[in-house]
């Protein structure tokens, strides 16, 4: 009996080291090899699990406290995960008691803040639990140089992107940034997205926001995401706008710790 695999390799197989995407899987007859088929099913299960994984805002709040930061635990108007998935509109608004809590905070502390940071589970609590604190570490160490005042960080359960608009408006913030779990993909169940808005208020559309996507070690690094976000924030303050009228033209010079990067595979480098 031959030890030779019945699977036929793909000539592009060397490219797989450059991407987690499903390329050059080979074939077994007219179908996929068994290993590739099982890996696909496993990745699909991971993506489904990421959507339904419970959010743990208290753990994030503890992490913020260890960093000397305040965290407010809030909930959207979606009462549970099933409602959240079926009624996106409810995930965009806070529960009335949570909105009242933010109004009271604003009345007690007076005046607005330059920046309100929101962390929400979105469609992948896994992404938030893995990447929110490391990303905040990179971002917050750069903020003092800008001289911006910071509102308490809001931790929102069952939140959608637009919930940051209401939070920013209630806190009187000039800018909002929401860190939220993106819809899981088959090679990325834990991608974190950042959405930035200048002059937030209820009723804004996606055209008023800037998005930085796929923040995770296997995608856009924390340092590069913070670098791009700070550029957008500076330009927004200067031009007093955000969204489609504000383009990401940040310098992309290599950051410390970014590594040497892959070479040109066509030339046999890297």
Curated annotation (Swiss-Prot):
Binds between the large and small subunits. It is an enzyme of class 4 (lyase). GO terms for molecular function: cobalamin binding; ethanolamine ammonia-lyase activity. One of its GO terms (biological process) is amino acid metabolic process. One of its GO terms (cellular component) is ethanolamine degradation polyhedral organelle. Keywords: Bacterial microcompartment, Cobalamin, Cobalt, Lyase. It catalyses: ethanolamine = acetaldehyde + NH4(+). Its EC number is 4.3.1.7. It is found in: Bacterial microcompartment. Its cofactor is adenosylcob(III)alamin. Adenosylcob(III)alamin binds at residues 161, 182, 211. NCBIfam families: PRK05465.1 (NF003971). Catalyzes the deamination of various vicinal amino-alcohols to oxo compounds. Allows this organism to utilize ethanolamine as the sole source of nitrogen and carbon in the presence of external vitamin B12. Belongs to the EutC family. This is Ethanolamine ammonia-lyase small subunit. The lineage of its organism: Bacteria, Pseudomonadati, Pseudomonadota, Gammaproteobacteria, Pseudomonadales.
């Amino acid at each position: 009996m031959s030890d030779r695999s019945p699977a036929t390799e793909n000539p592009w197989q060397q490219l797989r080291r450059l991407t987690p995407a499903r390329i050059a899987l080979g074939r077994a007859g007219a179908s996929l090899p068994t290993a590739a088929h099982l890996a696909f099913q496993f990745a699909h299960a991971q993506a489904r699990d990421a959507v339904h994984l419970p959010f743990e805002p208290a753990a994030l709040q503890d992490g913020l406290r260890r960093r000397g930061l305040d965290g407010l635990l809030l909930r959207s108007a979606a009462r549970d995960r099933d409602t959240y998935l079926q009624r996106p509109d409810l995930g965009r608004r806070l529960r009335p008691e949570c909105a009242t809590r933010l109004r009271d905070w604003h009345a007690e502390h007076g005046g607005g803040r330059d920046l309100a940071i929101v962390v929400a589970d979105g469609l992948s609590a896994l992404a938030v639990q893995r990447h929110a604190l490391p990303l905040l570490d990179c971002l917050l160490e750069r903020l003092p140089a800008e001289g911006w005042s910071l509102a308490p960080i809001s931790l929102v359960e069952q939140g959608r992107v637009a919930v940051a608009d209401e939070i920013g408006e209630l806190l009187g913030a000039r800018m909002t940034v929401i860190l939220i779990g993106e819809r899981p993909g088959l090679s990325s169940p834990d991608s974190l997205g950042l959405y930035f808005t200048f002059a937030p208020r209820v009723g804004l559309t996606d055209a008023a926001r800037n998005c930085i996507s796929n923040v995770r070690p296997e995608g856009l690094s924390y340092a590069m995401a913070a670098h791009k976000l700070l550029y957008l924030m500076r330009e927004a303050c200067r031009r007093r706008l955000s969204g489609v009228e504000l383009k990401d033209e940040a310098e992309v010079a290599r950051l410390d710790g970014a590594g040497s990067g892959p070479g040109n595979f066509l030339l046999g480098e890297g």
